[in-house]
């Protein structure tokens, strides 16, 4: 089968045409891939950064955001049928630890990821345990379903706390941050402010309903950044701090600024992964009585039910997809992702 694989311990990704179709077991399904989306993680693997060098076995078929069709299944599978349109949870868990047995599978200590630790979805076929497979409702397109993984991250982060009637600050306007703007607006947030240094994506955020999309590139230090944020708050009628913070960047200055402008009793969801250690004002957390929640992946499968229900209720995520390419143009897709001048990039695996 055709697949995209990390074949060398250097930057790049390579097309192969003779990868074996994976074998499925008693409780597995075989999925024919229709669409995949390129994730920031895939870009890290492409660039072969320090995290990738320490994590990714080579050779490895990568990718974990997908939509496809069930074409075969093991004898023990009763939850899906051949012909079902599906996506799937890319975190594979042990099912036996305390958290798994308590229904908190997203907190499994033994989690491994498709396209990271085991064969991924950048291939014509993918094998996955049936318990990880999620049926796609007829009203949701394959393109949108292929973005369920990052959308689930955005849903989990944004809906960890109530957003209705609240003032929300989002730091980081990557695709997940942009999805969070859509989610917060759909859920009735009062004011939504988002920060980034990428003007293309900040304009997308404005189009998605952000009250203010602030380019923080011009500000030379933390004091200037906080001063400008307080001016923004004043300009939009905020007399107190933000009620909810959604941290999507992993950038020290963004987190420090967020802590500075949160209201007393504010709540923060932290999804962004830092490249190194982060220094925070512990006093701001204590004396403001802030609540912090770390986010990893999606709740299985509450997050999936929430996002499909919201999409079916009218939340429009289609504009997050800015580029659609055939799989043979995968190099162009990765170059577009590297440029940052995009939302989600979808790869079509049809013949």
Swiss-Prot record:
UniProt lineage: Bacteria, Pseudomonadati, Pseudomonadota, Gammaproteobacteria, Thiotrichales
Descriptive protein name: L-threonine 3-dehydrogenase
Residues where Zn(2+) 2 binds: 94, 97, 100, 108
SUPFAM superfamilies, per database record: GroES-like (SSF50129), NAD(P)-binding Rossmann-fold domains (SSF51735)
Family designation: Belongs to the zinc-containing alcohol dehydrogenase family.
Co-factor binding details: Binds 2 Zn(2+) ions per subunit.
Class of this enzyme: oxidoreductase
Reactions catalysed: L-threonine + NAD(+) = (2S)-2-amino-3-oxobutanoate + NADH + H(+)
GO molecular function (one): L-threonine 3-dehydrogenase activity
Amino acids binding NAD(+): 176, 196, 201, 271-273, 295-296
